[in-house]
Amino acid sequence: MKKLLCAVLLSPLLYSNAVLADDAKQLRETLTGTESLKADFKQTVTDVNKKVIQSGAGVFALAHPNQFYWHLTAPDESKIVADGKDLWIYNPFAEEVVIMDFTQAITASPIALLVHRDDATWSQYAVTKKQDCYEIKPKATDAGISAVNVCFNKGTLNKFNVLDDKGNLSQFDLSNQHSISTGDKALFKFVLPDNVDVDDQRIKTQ
């Protein structure tokens, strides 16, 4: 899951800038209608030879602006929570919590477009529409994620996948999608567990 927060590879553009701009506009308009979302997910990870190397399940949620929740419940528990300012990565098995600046951690990933609305963030990616899906590729040259595909059914996000630079493809199928309720807002507030090691990587201001 940390790979979702890494920098991403530059890939060749196959379409004109005008077409890409139109596709990005359509995706942006679709996401504007999704101010918040909560869903269950099933995850399947395949390697470069299309062999399944991991399966999992959990709960996914997002809310505008800049709030994100990811709780992998199987096979091993892990949690990622972004409250709009900080991002927390919790590994219960290792009894460790990593804290990062939200903008620094998430902006380098195409996943950022799901929770960001600002022009500066969108200008960092090339978007290509393919039927009901949008392929998002970064314009950066750092290693990490090669592309993200997000797919919609009647305007509702129903699946997405993440391709990393090693050829591993993580596919996520969503179900039970609905808007965030008042009670669900607590998902975006991370409560630090007792007796865990804390690795605070936030940039300290003088």
UniProtKB/Swiss-Prot annotation:
GO terms for biological process: lipoprotein localization to outer membrane; lipoprotein transport. Keywords: Chaperone, Periplasm, Protein transport, Signal, Transport. InterPro entries: LolA/LolB/LppX (IPR029046), OM_lipoprot_carrier_LolA-like (IPR004564), OM_lipoprot_carrier_LolA_Pbac (IPR018323). CDD domains: LolA (cd16325). SUPFAM superfamilies: Prokaryotic lipoproteins and lipoprotein localization factors. It comes from the Bacteria. It is found in: Periplasm. It holds the Pfam family LolA. Residues 1-21 form the signal peptide. Disulfide bonds: none annotated. Transmembrane segments: none annotated. GO terms for cellular component: outer membrane-bounded periplasmic space. Its main location: periplasm. Belongs to the LolA family. Participates in the translocation of lipoproteins from the inner membrane to the outer membrane. Only forms a complex with a lipoprotein if the residue after the N-terminal Cys is not an aspartate (The Asp acts as a targeting signal to indicate that the lipoprotein should stay in the inner membrane). NCBIfam families: lolA. Monomer. This is Outer-membrane lipoprotein carrier protein. It comes from Shewanella oneidensis (strain ATCC 700550 / JCM 31522 / CIP 106686 / LMG 19005 / NCIMB 14063 / MR-1).
